């Protein structure tokens, strides 16, 4: 049995959860999320103490694997609609900067042209000091994917550390080639 999966998921007071088979709908102050969980698990809502219990339907390996996954997905949905998620990125390098125009993030990262990224539904971009980009939303998976796309515009290089990196990310630095003496 999954050690993560056997813990019940607490539901805050402002959040409502509805089940339709394996489809879980979570509604909270920040918005609404819906997700269909994989086969092999069953979900039940305990109304008396506001918890959600995820349990495997059989003892097969696939069912046990999906048990912890499903519990974590539901917990992330509840956390997202109550508090939201955000991921910060730093732009390092001379002349590299970012700005927001409407729902579009415009990044000047050393190319001959600025790179534009349109924010998908449920994601917002915020720029501080032209070098710090904050990607925020209620869906943890979508926030992480969009932050990864922003980082992929110009990943940090190991010699000078220039590029776009996650806040707090440590870049493994390499020594440059030593010249002939």
From Swiss-Prot:
InterPro entries: Ribosomal_uL6-like (IPR000702), Ribosomal_uL6-like_a/b-dom_sf (IPR036789), Ribosomal_uL6_a/b-dom (IPR020040), Ribosomal_uL6_bac-type (IPR019906), Ribosomal_uL6_CS (IPR002358). Keywords: Ribonucleoprotein, Ribosomal protein, RNA-binding, rRNA-binding. Pfam families: Ribosomal_L6. GO terms for biological process: cytoplasmic translation. GO terms for molecular function: rRNA binding; structural constituent of ribosome. GO terms for cellular component: cytosolic large ribosomal subunit. Part of the 50S ribosomal subunit. This protein binds to the 23S rRNA, and is important in its secondary structure. It is located near the subunit interface in the base of the L7/L12 stalk, and near the tRNA binding site of the peptidyltransferase center. HAMAP family: Ribosomal_uL6_B. Belongs to the universal ribosomal protein uL6 family. This is Large ribosomal subunit protein uL6. It comes from Synechococcus sp. (strain CC9605). The lineage of its organism: Bacteria, Bacillati, Cyanobacteriota, Cyanophyceae, Synechococcales.
